C-alpha cells in the first residue's frame, strides 16, 4: 500500500533498510513482487565480492555501486525502486556524526542528498524473523518532511528510524559491522579493541 502510493507519484522510491540478519532474504522476497535496483559496496574479499555481486545482479533490476550514486539518481528519476542500507561506518571523510543508541556514529548523509536530487520517496523496509520461524516484510509510510535541509538532522532521522526497528529484535541486527568504529575529536580512539575472537566493546 505505502509502496504503491509512493510509486504513483512518479519520482521513484528508496527502499530504506538496515543491516539485519535477514536483509538478503528480505531483499530477495520483495523483488519477487517489485523489481528493485540494489546499492552495493565493493568488498575487500574479491571472491565474496564476486559472489555477492553475481547474486544481487541476478535477482535485481540492476546494481548501483556506492562510490557512484549517479546511476541511482537516474533510476529514481525513471520511477524505479532502489533498495538501500546506509547504516555502516564509512569513515569521517564521507560522514557526519549523529547518534545511534545514544552513541556517536559516523553516518553517511547520502540518503538526504539523493532525495534532494531525485525527489524520491523514502519507504522504511524491515525484514524480520518471527518466533514461529516465519518471516515478515514490513513496509512503512514514506518519510514526511525529509530531507529537512541539515545533513546532521537528516542523518539523525535515518539513525532514529533504524534504531526503532532494531529495538524490536536487537539480536537480528548485524552488530558485527562495528557501527561505532569512527569517533570524532577527543573521542577519536576506537570504541572497539581487538580480542582473540575479533573485536569487542571496551
PLM regions and their residue ranges:
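Nucleotide-sugar donor-binding and catalytic loop/hinge architecture
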Residues: 1-11
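Non-catalytic C-terminal accessory region of glycerolipid acyltransferases
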Residues: 5-7, 32-35, 67-202
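Catalytic core of membrane glycerolipid acyltransferases/transacylases, capturing the structured
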Residues: 9-67, 78, 89-99, 103
